[in-house]
């Protein structure tokens, strides 16, 4: 179920700077970055208690504004969804305010968005990479990043020392991967790291 039909109208009545955003599924608005936190706080107060997703759009080099941050929020009591989009004003160093103060779950969403797009979330309590390693020089979801990737030297990190755990972590680069092509069960046939090719029905290999 989407947001009530008058949700967008009510929001624009309180925030005249908000404009309609074309959308084929959810009610959606565009919000100036200077007002995005005020709008998100208002939605939270109106019952949108869950940040379902936070992502970004890279409109490619030469576009201005180049980056748009998109929030998908849900009022769980009503089953009502709403979409908010805001443009980053600085194309060279895109930034928006952090929404962690409104929805604590925004923490990892914003870290992923920073990791993949290089967008800074100002006021985030721990803004660092979440998928790639510290020091990785690229932002893989930017339009200029090639589909085939860029060959990069992996850092020689002592995982146990860094994570302070005795658990042997999977290889940072993944693999070596193995697959059981003769398996009828798709789960069993799925390629996986060799040292993790075990489950509750199949003993861990020595």
Label each region the model flagged.
Residues 1-206:
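Terminal low-complexity/charged segments
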């Amino acid at each position: 179920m989407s947001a009530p039909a008058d949700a967008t109208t009510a929001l624009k009545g309180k925030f005249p700077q908000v404009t309609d955003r074309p959308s084929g599924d959810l009610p959606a608005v565009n919000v100036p970055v200077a007002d995005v936190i005020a709008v998100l706080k208002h939605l939270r107060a109106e019952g949108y208690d869950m940040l379902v997703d936070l992502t970004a759009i890279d409109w490619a080099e030469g576009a201005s504004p180049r980056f748009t941050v998109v929030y998908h929020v849900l009022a769980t009591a009503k089953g009502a969804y709403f979409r908010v989009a805001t443009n980053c004003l600085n194309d060279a160093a895109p930034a928006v305010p952090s929404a962690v103060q409104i929805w604590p779950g925004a923490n990892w969403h914003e870290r992923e968005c920073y990791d993949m797009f290089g967008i800074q979330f100002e006021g985030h309590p721990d803004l660092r990479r979440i998928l790639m390693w510290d020091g990785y020089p690229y932002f893989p979801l930017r339009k200029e990043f090639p589909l085939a990737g860029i060959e990069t030297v992996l850092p020689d990190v002592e995982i146990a020392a860094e994570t302070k755990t005795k658990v042997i972590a999977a290889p940072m680069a993944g693999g070596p991967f193995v697959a059981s092509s003769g398996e009828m069960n798709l789960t069993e046939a799925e390629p996986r790291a060799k040292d993790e090719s075990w489950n509750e029905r199949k003993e861990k290999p020595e």
